[in-house]
Swiss-Prot record:
The gene is rik1. GO terms for cellular component: CLRC complex; cytoplasm; mating-type region heterochromatin; nucleus; pericentric heterochromatin; rDNA heterochromatin; spindle pole body; subtelomeric heterochromatin. Component of the Clr4 methyltransferase complex (ClrC) which contributes to the establishment of heterochromatin by specifically methylating histone H3 to form H3K9me. ClrC preferentially ubiquitylates H3K14 and ClrC-mediated H3 ubiquitination promotes clr4 methyltransferase activity for the methylation of H3K9. H3K9me represents a specific tag for epigenetic transcriptional repression by recruiting swi6/HP1 to methylated histones which leads to transcriptional silencing within centromeric heterochromatin, telomeric regions and at the silent mating-type loci. This is Chromatin modification-related protein rik1. It comes from Schizosaccharomyces pombe (strain 972 / ATCC 24843) (Fission yeast). It is found in: Nucleus; Cytoplasm, Cytoskeleton, Microtubule organizing center, Spindle pole body; Chromosome.
Length: 1040
């Protein structure tokens, strides 16, 4: 079975560095997933993406260095597959060039794979130091200009050396020392010491070492000034500088990263494990006298900071794996730019009974918790934009005699002609010092209602004015105008002649004039009406109903003979729809989209009329002749929208926002689009209960920046609302580990109990809960204490199955009491249960995958497979095929053959895919369109916020495999053929996983990327190389 994997890579920043990778430009180099992304950085423009460098493995280190005699920096890249290489940017060919080819610097595994690795660059650009194992490093010398010309490389092959100390906790290089001096924080098992070692590059020998600090317990060391050193302890900060030692008090915390402020001497920024930032400053007071100050910066804390980088004087980049990464102006402490990030993903939930294929993601950390709804949405592409501030409303008058755009401001209306390429030309003859409320045109004339008059223009722009006092609202349809006077009177005009008038008891809040002789009206008395009239007749009410709150917006649409659709927005994100036949109510429903009031706008195309529901969660309403349908709409945030159609018949939209106007065109193919809802607590699991979401949440209460307490809750939340209410809370020492839905009114909960001052759970509890008072609260029906923490729950036939510690047990409910029927001990911690029919699949902590069943009295093991590493997640893909995610970021396909006679031959590992990320959740996602080979069958999520899909390939496996090989070869064309072939050999699998990312990415390549790719193919632009790439794209289109 061949599978295709397509992942939406996370935006988490693994690490970052600032340099001049491109000469004369401030560059920020970000490591995100399997790419090195280069951004140009400035205070005015923020982060501007420049180029991306694909990688064949995740990055362990990336360090800039500048070879002598050059004005730009090279990048030294160390990968997690124990390979390093160096690259630089070629200004002539505008492409990445490999300076030093990939070299595997370690051929044996260290005894401690979790030991911290170090990569240090000497500021005098003499050498790069890279860890080989716990005590050994390799010194790679940076070559001089003469040596670089001879060898064609900027670095040599290096030489190894070892420290005479063990248990190294941190390491740095002193600044401006005549001989490279490495300072090591190490321990003898009882106490910690700080020792400096001088490395002689000519003799390749390491000195004996000079003890700088004894019996300290620091968390970080860093260079300070010229040949100075800072040692950070949990309560004190020690400084060695100019032969003196100074100690100051510091916060009780553990430090992680540091960066010197560029342009500032003796100024540093450090961060701790809680995500807080601190400034460390020093100033010279006199001869051998200086001061040292540390203060906490008033910047909100970050989750899991991965890097601190000073770009240039005043700018600081903070990279994060679990929250937004930000570029901050230190002078104003304001955000200049940011890179959004979901954070770790805890759960995936497919939203069933949904006409669109949509799913829900639970993600985040205590400071970045959110629900993300992924729905197929219609997308509005931005074709152009114009910066104009202060616009209240935009209105388009088509073909008079050319398209006119009227922009309403608080005290004036400015008219423009819409030219080609969406250029605007001012038309002063139609501009006025009055605010325009409504506009309509027909037969070479148009009607304009402002705050003080009704104006009718003919084709020669001659106007007839009717002055009306106290106009509060208005709507126009062709030559008719419905004008609200003094809030309560409604006057109907045909051109400049009044044909009907009626005064109401309540003030009118909104109205819509969409069809001849019919008007939809909303009142402050929380009523809506459909009014009818005819020329020279009175106004009568054809339909009337009450609404729960004040109607803010209304739209009335005729959808056939005697059939109307009435939409009323009456609250924050809530609106009600009414379908009427001969003004009798046929159907009504209430919808809730977003959290801000909905405004309605028509969007008429050749295929029919749609209603745009615009707020912070835009939607499109269609299907007026049958059941109403609602499709999410992906569009720029705006507070007003209008439509216009050009001379060729193409339909466009104009959106109004604080930044000005955007010209949009509807893309008819729906795309998977996220919508984020922020939460106060971290959602760990989601279950649907009666059209509501039941969330298992984690609340972290920060006592101060040093400590916090955690509590687990069960909360209910509406699908389109960020408001939630708590239905059950657990005690402070009890963690809610798993929730299992039994039916629409009850659920089974597994917990772990931690005693005070204990790090691991001492036991667990199984709780049966039941809803009462219409999902208002949960009550405990039954509970039982278990000997270990509950890990997983499932339903097995008419009973429940629970995994706790090393045991798996069958639990039954008898007379509202939970009782263990039978149990089995597996000898290792159980990580996951998968129940399919009578078979139970179990993944445990030592990498075993076991299948067994329960015969009514005992468990019987029928198959077992041992992986060479830990299993993090497993799922039943289809039939008897399981997909396994391992700790090293691999996906493995495991087929179960129950008919095999030999117990050890019942599992066959069919293929392997290098995902380079740890999977946190698998979720089945049924296929609806079998014609598309990339239609997902299973979704997966990862620990750094990536979401992906997997699908079986029923045909074209060999063609697609060959196609991905071609694309991959082009993708890594900056490598030599020999280096690429060694990478390709590692990716070969008997039954292939097809990399869907390659195919999708190439389909989206822009022309600039194609030309850059052509340079990569043949190192110069040529028609021949372009034809190769174009042929590849045509092949993709034919297969996909």
């Amino acid at each position: 079975m061949a599978l295709c994997v397509h992942s939406f890579w996370a935006t988490a920043v693994d690490t970052a560095t600032s340099c001049h990778f491109i000469s004369s430009e401030n560059c920020l180099v970000l490591l995100q997933a399997l790419k090195i992304n280069i951004y140009l950085c400035s205070e005015v423009h923020g982060l501007q993406f420049f180029t991306s460098i694909p990688l064949f493995s995740t990055v362990k280190h990336i360090r800039p260095y500048r070879p002598p005699g050059l004005d730009r920096d090279y990048l030294f890249v160390v990968l997690n597959d124990d390979t390093y290489f160096s690259i630089y940017w070629d200004e002539d060919y505008q492409k990445v060039i490999v300076d030093h080819p990939p070299v595997r610097y370690r051929v044996t595994f260290p005894w401690n794979r979790n030991a911290k690795s170090y990569c240090l660059v000497d500021l005098r650009m003499r050498a790069i130091f890279l860890s080989i194992d716990e005590i050994s490093m390799i010194c790679i010398r940076i070559l001089s200009a003469e040596e670089r010309l001879k060898t064609g490389r900027s670095i040599d092959s290096g030489f190894p050396f070892s420290f005479p100390v063990h248990l190294i906790y941190d390491m740095c290089i002193l600044n401006d020392s005549s001989t490279p001096t490495l300072v090591v924080l190490h321990s003898d098992g009882l106490d910690c010491y700080v020792t400096a070692f001088l490395l002689d590059l000519s003799s390749k020998s390491l000195g004996k070492g000079i003890r700088l600090f004894e019996r300290v317990k620091p968390s970080m060391i860093m260079p300070f000034g010229k040949r100075g050193l800072l040692v950070f302890e949990s309560l004190f900060i020690h400084c060695m500088y100019r032969g003196n030692f100074v100690t100051i008090n510091g916060p009780c915390t553990t430090y992680m990263h540091w960066t010197p402020l560029k342009g500032q001497k003796m100024h540093y920024i450090v961060c701790d494990t809680n995500g807080y930032l601190f400034g460390v400053y020093s100033s010279i007071l006199g001869k051998n006298k200086w001061s040292l100050v540390m203060e906490r910066l008033p910047i909100p804390p970050f989750d899991f900071i991965t890097s601190l980088n000073s770009i240039h004087e005043g700018l600081l980049f903070i990279g994060s794996k679990n929250s937004e990464s930000k570029l901050i102006n230190l002078s104003t402490l304001k955000d200049v730019d940011s890179i959004p990030n979901l954070g770790p993903i805890h759960d995936l939930l497919v939203l069933k009974n949904d006409i669109e294929k949509s799913f829900l993601v639970c993600a985040g950390t205590p400071r970045n918790a959110s629900l993300i709804y992924f729905q197929h949405a219609l997308k509005l592409d931005i074709l152009g934009q114009t910066k104009i501030s202060g616009i209240l409303r935009a209105m388009v008058l088509p073909s008079y005699p050319e398209h006119k755009l009227f922009l309403g401001f608080p005290s004036e209306t400015v008219a423009f002609n819409i030219k080609e390429d969406f250029q605007l030309e001012l038309d002063p003859s139609l501009s006025t010092k009055e605010r325009t409320i409504a506009l309509s045109g027909t037969n070479g004339e148009f009607v304009q209602v402002t705050s003080t008059f009704l104006c009718i223009y003919d084709s020669a722009k001659r106007s007839r004015l009717v002055y009306i006092e106290k106009i509060t609202n208005a709507a126009c349809y062709q030559e008719y105008s419905a004008i609200v006077i003094n809030g309560t009177a409604l006057a109907i005009f045909k051109k400049d002649t009044e044909v009907a008038r009626k005064v109401f008891e309540s003030e009118i809040s909104c109205l819509d004039f969409s069809a001849q002789f019919q008007i939809g009206v909303g009142f402050w008395s929380k009523q809506v009406m459909i009014l009818t009239f005819s020329d020279n007749s009175s106004i009568s009410c054809a339909f009337q109903t009450n609404v729960p709150s004040l109607p803010r917006n209304i739209i009335l649409e005729g959808v056939g003979v005697d059939r109307n659709l009435l939409l009323v927005s009456s609250g924050s994100g809530e609106f009600k729809s009414y379908v009427l036949f001969k003004n009798n109510l046929v159907f009504s429903e209430t919808k809730h989209f977003g959290t801000t009031p909905v405004s309605f706008r028509r969007f008429t195309m050749n295929i029919g009329t749609y209603i745009i529901c615009n707020n912070d969660c835009p939607h499109m309403v269609y299907g007026f002749n049958g059941a109403l349908c609602y499709m999410p709409l992906s569009m720029p945030q705006s507070y007003d929208v209008c439509q216009f159609r050009d001379n060729s018949g193409k339909d466009f939209l104009i959106s109004v926002s604080l930044g000005g106007l955007k010209f949009l065109q509807l893309n008819p193919l729906p795309e998977l689009t996220p919508r984020k809802v922020l939460l106060e607590h971290v959602p760990l699991q989601a279950i649907i209960f009666q059209n509501k979401l039941l969330l298992r949440t984690l609340e972290n209460r920060y006592e101060d920046y040093e400590s916090y307490k955690e509590n687990y809750h069960l909360e209910l939340v509406d699908s389109y609302d960020d408001n939630s209410f708590r239905v059950f809370s657990f005690t402070e020492n009890e963690r809610c580990e798993k929730v299992l839905k039994i039916n629409e009114s009850s659920l089974l909960v597994g917990t772990s109990i931690i005693e005070q001052d204990k790090l691991v759970p001492v036991n667990g509890r199984l709780i049966l809960l039941e809803f009462e008072k219409e999902l208002q609260s949960l009550k405990v029906v039954s509970s039982m204490v278990l000997s270990a923490a509950v890990i997983d729950l499932g339903v097995y036939n008419d009973r429940y199955i629970v995994a706790f510690g090393q045991q798996v047990a069958i639990v039954k409910l008898t007379e509202e009491r939970l009782m263990i029927d039978s149990r089995i001990s597996l000898g290792s911690i159980v990580l996951q249960l998968i129940v399919e029919g009578n078979e139970i699949a179990i993944a445990d902590s030592i990498g075993r995958f076991t299948i067994m069943y329960f015969d009514g009295q005992k468990f019987i093991v029928v198959a077992r497979y041992l992986f060479g590493e830990n299993i993090v997640k497993a799922a039943l893909y289809e039939g008897t095929v399981y997909i396994i995610a391992t700790n090293s970021g691999l996906l493995k396909l495991l087929r179960y053959n129950k008919d095999a006679k030999n117990f050890n031959d019942r599992f066959i590992c069919e293929s392997v895919y290098h995902l380079h990320d740890k999977v946190s959740k698998f979720q089945n996602f049924p296929i609806t369109n079998t014609n598309s080979f990339l239609e997902p069958k299973m979704l997966f999520a990862t620990e750094i916020g990536a979401i992906g899909s997997i699908v079986s390939l029923k045909d074209k496996e060999l063609e697609l495999e060959e196609l991905t090989r071609k694309i991959r070869k082009l993708k890594f064309s900056y490598l030599s053929s020999m280096d690429y072939e060694s990478i390709e050999a590692d990716l070969i699998s008997p039954v292939p996983f097809i990399d869907g990312d390659l195919v999708i990415d190439v389909k989206r390549w822009a022309s600039s990327e194609l030309f850059r790719l052509c340079r990569s193919v043949e190192h110069r632009e040529s028609l021949n190389s372009y034809q190769k790439v174009q042929a590849l794209l045509e092949e993709i289109q034919s297969l996909c």
